[in-house]
Amino acid sequence: VPLAYLFAYALHRTLIPFKSLWRGISLLPLLAPSMLPGIALVYLFGNQGLLRSLLTESIYGYWGLVLGEVIYTFPHALMILLSALSMSDARLFDAASSLGASSWRTFRSVTWSSSRHGIFAALCLVFTLTITDFGIPVVVGGDYQVLALEAYKAVLGQQQFGRGALIGMLLLLPALLTFGVDVWLRKRQRDAMSSRAQFYLPKANFQRDTLYLIFVMLICALFLLVFGTAVYSSFIQFWPYNLSFSLRHYNFEGLPGGWLAYTNSIILAFYTATIGCFLIFMGAYLIEKTASHSWLNNLLRMLSFVPMAVPGLVLGLGYVFFFNLPNNPLNFLYGSMVLLVLCSIAHFFTTAYMTASTALRQLDKEFEAASLSLKAPLYRHFWRITIPLCLPALLDIYRYLFVSAMTTVSAAIFLYSPDTILAAVAVLNMDDAGNIGGAAAMSTLILTTSAGVSILLSIASQGVLRRTQAWHQREAKQ
């Protein structure tokens, strides 16, 4: 979290060049399964690693877990901190400067006070992600025992579902505790921006900007080294003895998963993004734009935050106990793609809902008033006004659901069948079988697919934003 805070501060409070480039590189771990940083660390610092001599201890164990989880959780914390540091009132900085406050005093009184709730939210998220992740512990954990890996071994390795459920509850308790504290702090947080606030623009400072640029470049260089090594290793004949170019790791025939797993992941991501985007946006619209039954809206709004507090591993265990019951009429769904889609939508519901809800709240109520005065039916207003204005947010939701479904492993690890195995699960199985080259190749496919879809949707979102916001620009010119 401290590294992510400094990175976010550099992007928002300095004048370093190429901010979009640094931000894009820092978000790379979001596009790959959590096992990929672990695989890259093995190639870099493992027994046959390129940089093995730089470490005095083995990468397999505590320090491997720490380094892998830092890389994996960094972009998650960064996104929260970027949001926390994006809103600042320039009048507060002007007042501090007029009173002769030092840079440190201004930072402590203005910047820190307005962003400390975001820091705690990032701490809660990183804590929850770390204790519930078992992708990195599987790859570089060694003999170091973690709860998530024990739950995985209990259910799949030993068929001890009761023990797995107990460990799942232990994982749920700290996640619920941190989530509850975060909600309580959010209620006490004051608005950082008022209606009269002025947008803050940092002033040029060569020494400060140079130091932060060096820091940002070092972080991005680390990410490029890690992910570049993983991608490079997937095209190597036999690491580290034969470094000639080869595509043999992409020949997944005869291996658990293979191209079927990759195809299944694309199908899962497509249906999760398409169906989830529609259901979540419609649900957010009914909650935010329905005036009647406010108590019901508040209840539904509160329930929409529940998936954020439930780790994916616990959610997957719950689906196993419910859908795997022989007397359950829905038992036929167990192991099917339908159940994987439902679980993925539920798992990633909260973030997508918050995006849709924020977009809908930004729409002026005068739009509805104008439609009512013109006696336009609700569906026409929804299709002609709401959808076009919220289309950039819809594309962001679609991108988030697609990428998350492509990289998910925790919620789906207990729910797949041989016919519905996913690419991220195949990475896990290949690594367990000792085929780390195949695991790197599959991770590379996931990374490139997620990056390609994200770039296409980002371009589409910018184009839609220019068209839908053109009336704002004309109004400003007038």
State where each predicted segment sits:
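Membrane-water interface segments at the C-terminal ends of transmembrane alpha-helices
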Residues: V1-S86, S114-G135, G164-V183, R208-F238, ...
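Transmembrane alpha-helical segments of polytopic membrane transport and secretion proteins
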Residues: D182-M217, W295-N297, I459-Q478
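Transmembrane alpha-helical segments and their membrane-interface loop/helix boundaries
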Residues: E150, Q160-G168, L173-P174, R196-L213, ...
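Short amphipathic alpha-helical coupling elements at transmembrane boundaries
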Residues: R23-S26, A90-S98, S109, K153-L156, ...
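Juxtamembrane inter-helical linkers in multi-pass membrane proteins
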Residues: S102, R190-A204, W239-E253, P377
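Glycine-rich helix-loop "coupling/hinge" segments at transmembrane-helix boundaries
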Residues: F134-Q159, Y241-N242, V409-I436, A470-E475
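A short glycine-centered flexible hinge/capping loop motif at secondary-structure junctions
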Residues: L99-A101, I280, L374-A376
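Membrane-interface interhelical loops and short amphipathic "cap" helices
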Residues: L51-E57, V140-G141, V146-G162, S234-I236, ...
